[in-house]
Amino acid sequence: MKHSWFITLLLLLAAQASFGQTRPSHLGSFDDRKLHIGIQVGYTQSKFDLHYTENDSVRQTVLGTTSYYSPGFHINVIGDLRLGDHLNLRMLPGITLISRDMAFDWSEAYTSTHWKYDFRRTVESVYGEVPIEFKFRANRYNDFRPYLTAGASWGFDFASLRKNKNNDDESIIRLNPIDLRYTAGVGFDVFLSYVKFAIELKMAFGMIDLRVADDDYYTLSTTDFKSRTFMLSFTFEG
């Protein structure tokens, strides 16, 4: 997996911490609080999970369609509710700016008779999101505590409102505005003198087909647009 090096690093850090001092030196009672808030910022890479069409007439024109990871950014507010010694419930409303690159392999017969076509297109979105997830925490070792997350995220793409009004503009790939994703992540908390800092790696997988089926080869060449996003996040909680 492309990002497996980061998971390996987290596991190595967790193993190293398990042999260290177990008495906290900073914020010893921080995780005993029932409720606390914070902020999360991070880097994203997003793409579409595509399914190539079975329509033979379209396949003769578009020989293949591929999506590639493209960079983005997200910022979220964190509300964290302690449910037990090793379990928290988190809500992280925020904004995510993402783009997805798509590549199209046109047949020579089509390109020799048409002049208006694109080999690559970028689809941009601005999501207002409400992720809800469980945080499963391991034992704390000194000022270090690894954890896992699992949950779901509902999002609304504000950029799609403008794009979907331009029904006749073939330069735009239109998307359904609502997306629902399930998420899974791994990270570790570091307890500093005044705040708790965390580094987190998360994957989000879309469950809804985002494609608006227009009468053009850019959307006819696929039968499914589902989102996939990798997130590297930095969290500060007080």
Regions found by a protein language model. Give the residues of each.
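Mid-chain, structured segments of secreted extracytoplasmic proteins
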Residues: 66-106
